[in-house]
Amino acid sequence: MSMDHLVRIIEKKYEKKEIPDFRPGDTVRVHVKVIEGDRERTQVFEGIVIAKRGSGINRTFTVRRIGSHGVGVERIFPFHSPVVEKIEVVRKGKVRRAKLYYLRDVKGKIRIKERRD
């Protein structure tokens, strides 16, 4: 048995099964488990998916939202992290790029057409 095969077997154990299908341009709501001292709570981060990268257990996606005072906030979430409790797709967006890094430079309200599947 090769080392690569062993790594895949171990990774399979930690993969999450209930990940919804979403693409860059979609608006998602990510429920993140936050531990502060001895308290544990769920924090919701909602924004536009601007990138997906990696493969297997190392897959990540980047979500961008406009926070308070018009400051853009980006967070990178691993797909299979135990910290990510749930991912909801709020709205499906229609874009022509796999990486939407150009949204970092856009001022004002960002318009992404809605995809109808």
UniProtKB/Swiss-Prot annotation:
Keywords: Ribonucleoprotein, Ribosomal protein. Pfam families: Ribosomal_L19 (PF01245). Gene3D superfamilies: 2.30.30.790. It comes from the Bacteria. GO terms for cellular component: cytosolic large ribosomal subunit. GO terms for biological process: translation. GO terms for molecular function: structural constituent of ribosome. InterPro entries: Ribosomal_bL19, Ribosomal_bL19_CS, Ribosomal_bL19_sf, Translation_prot_SH3-like_sf. Belongs to the bacterial ribosomal protein bL19 family. This protein is located at the 30S-50S ribosomal subunit interface and may play a role in the structure and function of the aminoacyl-tRNA binding site. This is Large ribosomal subunit protein bL19.
